[in-house]
Design a protein with these regions (language model features):
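Surface-exposed interaction regions that form or flank ligand-binding interfaces
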Residues: 1-26, 32-38, 44-52, 60-163
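A contiguous binding-surface segment within folded domains or other stable secondary-structure elements
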Residues: 55
Length: 163
C-alpha cells in the first residue's frame, strides 16, 4: 500500500498477515508496528454510499449507476471484524507476556465512497489516503510502548509471518 510506504523505515508493516490463537483465526490486511504503537488497519475498497452503526451486524452499501439504477447490498460490519482481529492479536501478545495496547483503523480506499456512519468516538475510520497518513503520523497511544517490548513484538510477528 502506497500510503504506508510513505511512513519511513522505522515502521514495520505486515500485509495479509494470518493470525491464529486457539480456535480463533483471521487475516489482517495491515499490521503496523511503529516506534510508539501497534496498529491494525482493515482496508475496504467499497464504493457508493455506506451506512451503518457501530453496533450493527451488517451495514448497507448503496450504489447509484449512471443510468439511474440503484443497488443495495448488505456487508458485514467491518468494525466487528477489526475488533475480532484486535482480540486475537492481544491474546497472542498476552500469551507471550507482551501485554500491549493495540489500536485499529478502518480505511475505505475508494475515492468514490460516501460514509454515513454512527460510530463511537474511539472508532477510527479514514476515507482518504491523506486522512489515513495524517492519522498514522499523529496518533498517540494511551500508553506509549517501550522500545524493547516493540522489538520483541516485531520478532514475534516476523516469525509468525514466515511460518
Amino acid at each position: 500500500m502506497r500510503t504506508v510506504k510513505k511512513l519511513g523505515n522505522e515502521y514495520m508493516v505486515f500485509s495479509n498477515l494470518p493470525v491464529r490463537y486457539k480456535k480463533n483465526r483471521s487475516e489482517i490486511d495491515l499490521l503496523i508496528i511503529s516506534p510508539t504503537y501497534l496498529l491494525i488497519i482493515e482496508v475496504k475498497n467499497h464504493s457508493g454510499y455506506i451506512s451503518g452503526k457501530h453496533k450493527d451486524d451488517k451495514w448497507i452499501q448503496r450504489k447509484v449507476y449512471k443510468d439511474g439504477k440503484t443497488t443495495e447490498t448488505e456487508m458485514q460490519n467491518p468494525l466487528r471484524q477489526m475488533r475480532r482481529q484486535r482480540d486475537i492479536v492481544k491474546s497472542i501478545l498476552q500469551a507471550n507476556d507482551l501485554d500491549q495496547w493495540v489500536e485499529t483503523v478502518l480505511y475505505f480506499s475508494s475515492n468514490s465512497v460516501h460514509l454515513y456512519l454512527d460510530l463511537y468516538d474511539s472508532d477510527n475510520v479514514c476515507s482518504s489516503e491523506k486522512e489515513l497518513l495524517e492519522f498514522l503520523r499523529t496518533y498517540k497511544p494511551p500508553k506509549k510502548a517501550d522500545t524493547e517490548k516493540l522489538e520483541k513484538i516485531k520478532q514475534l510477528f516476523k516469525e509468525m509471518h514466515e511460518n
